[in-house]
Amino acid sequence: MTNLSDIIEKETGKQLVIQESILMLPEEVEEVIGNKPESDILVHTAYDESTDENVMLLTSDAPEYKPWALVIQDSNGENKIKML
């Protein structure tokens, strides 16, 4: 299995612990980030206390966990999106 924390570290340069993972439907993902995936997406969320940011790694569902996008949400609720 892909180590999801390693992907977050590679993309952000920070070692963060994933706190929760939730399943989202393609339509729900499209509403949030504007791009629609081909299948359901798992959203793995970590919190960066030093910057007060939520870091969300979006991957395909099990068993692949293929990285799809990284979303960093600042304390104002603004999203920075990087497609992977």
UniProtKB/Swiss-Prot annotation:
Name of the protein in its database record: Uracil-DNA glycosylase inhibitor
Functional description taken from the UniProt entry: This protein binds specifically and reversibly to the host uracil-DNA glycosylase, preventing removal of uracil residues from PBS2 DNA by the host uracil-excision repair system.
Gene3D superfamilies, alphabetized: Bacteriophage PBS2, uracil-glycosylase inhibitor
Signal peptide, first to last residue: none
SUPFAM superfamilies assigned to the protein according to its UniProt record, in alphabetical order: Uracil-DNA glycosylase inhibitor protein (SSF54441)
One Pfam family it belongs to: UDI
